[in-house]
Structures are given as C-alpha cells and as structure tokens.
C-alpha cells in the first residue's frame, strides 16, 4: 500500500473520528461528513486511474453529486434549526421532545 493510500485512509479515519467525537453541533458533523466524502472521492479516483478501469470512470462523479446533495440538504437543515432554536445542537433534531 503506497503512502498516498495511507494518507487518504488516515484522512477518512480522522474525519470519522471527528464525527464520533464532535457530534453535538450540526456544523461540526456536516464538516466531518464532507471530509469523509472528499477522502472517498480522492481514493476512488486514484484507484480508478491507477487500475485503468474505464467502465467505472463515472463513479467518482456520481459520488460528488451525492455529496453535493448531502451538503445542500445539511446546510438547509442547519439554517432551519439555527433560525428556529437559535443554536445548531443536534439534540434539537429530536422530534419526540415536548
């Protein structure tokens, strides 16, 4: 395994650990999710380019489309929660509260 793969895997792991540790704020969770998606995109692109997989060349672009949709929905949810409650805590997303 080359150093590039190790660094990208380390970036994914750090983003995942950040998602587990800083899950109280919605903005921190969204940033960690974006870091995970970016590292997956780079890893997938490098793997496809090195192995010359021409049939799978659209897969990273599809992943980017899903990442953009996830970012747009996450930011709209962040704006809605912050205008309604005044904070961006994830605990405000619980719909079963009175």
Curated annotation (Swiss-Prot):
Q: Superkingdom of the source?
A: Eukaryota
GO cellular component terms attached to this protein's record = mitochondrial inner membrane; respiratory chain complex I
The entry lists its GO molecular-function terms as: NADH dehydrogenase (ubiquinone) activity
Q: What is its main location?
A: mitochondrion
**Which family, according to the similarity comment?**
Belongs to the complex I subunit 4L family.
Q: How does it assemble?
A: Core subunit of respiratory chain NADH dehydrogenase (Complex I) which is composed of 45 different subunits.
- Name of protein: NADH-ubiquinone oxidoreductase chain 4L
The source organism is Neovison vison (American mink)
